[in-house]
Amino acid sequence: MLSYLKQNLHSYFSSRVLIFTLATAAIIFACATFYVISLESKNFSTIIGFLLVDLAIFLILGVVLTQKFFTKNNNNDSSKLQNRIVIAFSLVAAIPTIIVSVFSVYFFNLSVQAWFDKKISTVLDQSVIVAESYIAEHKLQLKETALAVAEDLSDMYYDLIHNPALFTKTLNTEAEMRSLDEAIVLNKSTNTIVANSYLSFSLSFATIPAHLIKKADLGELVEVKSDPTKIRMLIKLKEYNDVYLLVGRLVDNKIIDHVDATNGAAAEYNSLKNEIDNIQIKFSIMFIFIALLLLFVAISFGVIFTAKIVKPIKKLVTATDNVKDGDLTVQVPENEVDKDEIGTLYVAFNRMIKQLSRQQRDLVIAQRAMAWSDVAKKVAHEIKNPLTPILLASERLLKKFSPEIKERVEFENYLKMIIRHTNDIKNIVSEFVLFARLPAPKFTKSELVYLVKHIVEARKLLNDHILYKFESNVEQFDFMCDATQINQVMINLLKNAEESIEGRESGKIEVTIDVKDDFISVIVTDNGKGFPPELIGKATESYVTTSSKGMGVGLAIVKRIVEEHCGILDIANREAEGAIIDIKFDLKELDLKAKRLEM
């Protein structure tokens, strides 16, 4: 029963229907969540419910997609064991995350409700009311005082207006008697101060807003808010046009600061209380992102952890595939695994591959010996061919011209034939000996740019009908090499290029040195006839040539020298005409080889 359930559950999880269903549900619930959040009257419980459903859907979808991805790539780099471990890590991360999310949101909601308890709100509101009542009481008292002073001044205004000194004295008496910090009588028509108490600040109608003056004209008692530390009241004197009384009383700075602090704290508290739903929503969204991040971290950790387990087996499988493809130089690193069963398997595998490599090397040596035997036979055959006309010519000389030399022209022709075929023999034997007995390179530090440039200049003097061009991206370069062999390589390549240009009117040969990172390239290009397509793949093999001169071992020698110098020889035809030969040396490998030979 359990196996049947597991099998069907696995097939259901792997089906596209489930993925499509989850993706559709994710889109629908995401849109619904956005709609609920955007409503003016937000229901926090509904929003949290939608967010938790979104989290659950996304986590399940992530697990299913991960399982689907690894199943799809099962035949490539992943293994079934790795897939199972990664899926297990995903489930272990997803299920607790959902549970923790639900409880975290619930407890966060309880904590927030405790912060904004009704008792705290009541205390803050009462504090604001007390502070505002204090200021209101001061304003009420000042209003009553302003009305009383205005009444007194209105009764005495006719007598006081003609005696400014008496007006000022009376105004000061009123201010002292009623505990006013300032008292000013203003005339709007003349825009002047008629009288003021001693402690009053200079003031004009320009500093009083026009709408307040209009209210005062209507008989209202108006508050003038020009200084936060002072309460001022403006009133028009009865029966006197354009005459106004302004009284003021200072409020203690500590009280003002306390009132401002109380109002500020209450405003901030109420603002935070109004924003609490948004804060809870943001917290929930942040928690969802953290949960998804944890899921991805769990998957990543599962991949890394599984790779550590499966990596040794994968290396062994890869090495086996390389051996199957014919690479007998592959070895698995024994020092990277523990001394367990896998370590024993590594040791046995390496020993087996070394034995196979040794046997193959012995076989190659035997085949090479047979090849050299064929070479010797071919060389002997090539030597015998020019010897036959030499022998015949010598016999003819002996029989026909031994008594005396009468026909001089014919005699010279025979001699030229002997010389020509003798030179052929000399060239054949020289090339064979050079190829068969090429000495090991003796590495010394040489200036490569100077070496190549002077070879090019020397060939230019010998072939003035060919346009030579030399370029280098460095002025000089110290190169570990056997200068004699490198010289031989360049001469061989340039001679081949010159021979391919023979018969052309505008021959051109370019030699380029390019140093880049840990590699240096020497490139030779020409506009000659190039290589025949059927021979370009085996141009560096022995006895492959398109020339009537020599045995075709020149490029074979070049290849051997280049490989001895940790280089790669690349031969190709140009798109337009001619050939391009690129020699790329690995400087790091070359330095290591030179150091090994010095030891």
Swiss-Prot record:
Question: Membrane topology type, per the record?
Answer: Multi-pass membrane protein
Principal cellular location given in the protein's record: membrane
Q: What class of enzyme is it?
A: transferase
Locate the Phosphohistidine modifications and list their residues: H381
* Localization in the cell: Cell membrane
Q: PROSITE patterns, from UniProt? A: HAMP (PS50885), HIS_KIN (PS50109)
Q: Tell me its EC number(s), please.
A: 2.7.13.3
What Gene Ontology terms describe where this protein resides (cellular component)?
A: plasma membrane
Pfam families, per the entry? HAMP, HATPase_c, HisKA, NtrY_N
Keywords, comma-separated and alphabetical: ATP-binding, Cell membrane, Kinase, Membrane, Nucleotide-binding, Phosphoprotein, Transferase, Transmembrane, Transmembrane helix, Two-component regulatory system
Domain Histidine kinase residues, every copy: 378-589
Example of a GO MF term: ATP binding
- HAMP domain residues are 307-361
Membrane spanning stretches:
17-37, 44-64, 85-105, 285-305
SMART domains the UniProt entry points to: HAMP, HATPase_c, HisKA
Q: Which reaction does it catalyse?
A: ATP + protein L-histidine = ADP + protein N-phospho-L-histidine
Q: What is the role of this chain?
A: Member of the two-component regulatory system RC0948/RC0849.
UniProt protein name: Putative sensor histidine kinase NtrY-like
